[in-house]
Amino acid sequence: MSTSEFLSRASKTKAKASEIKEKDDVELPFCKYAERNGCKALKLTYLRKKGFPDRTVICPGGKVFFIEFKRPGKPLEPLQKIAQSLLLSFGFEYYVCDQPGQAEKILDNFLAFSS
């Protein structure tokens, strides 16, 4: 599937309130942590199509990676797997986080080894 086909087939997601609250419990603290470490964890609403990762993390020096936040043990959806493959094929790093504190450890490692 081409990039344009993926973007045209994808539609905006509407998560249930319970899912948003559970994801916010992990996602929002990570965003604050990223800020404290000189990075930005952006939710790209223009690109927020079904399957696109939850956060695009931009760091000093032009370093970028993507994070998908999931409930513990929940696998990626089919469109998320397509987006993951697309981003990896362009050379970006892509992570799936399903535990509190996991994204913070990923950011620490990314900053330590990408300089």
Language-model features, listed with the residues they occupy:
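Catalytic phosphate/metal-binding cores of nucleic-acid and nucleotide-processing enzymes, i.e., regions
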Residues: M1-S115
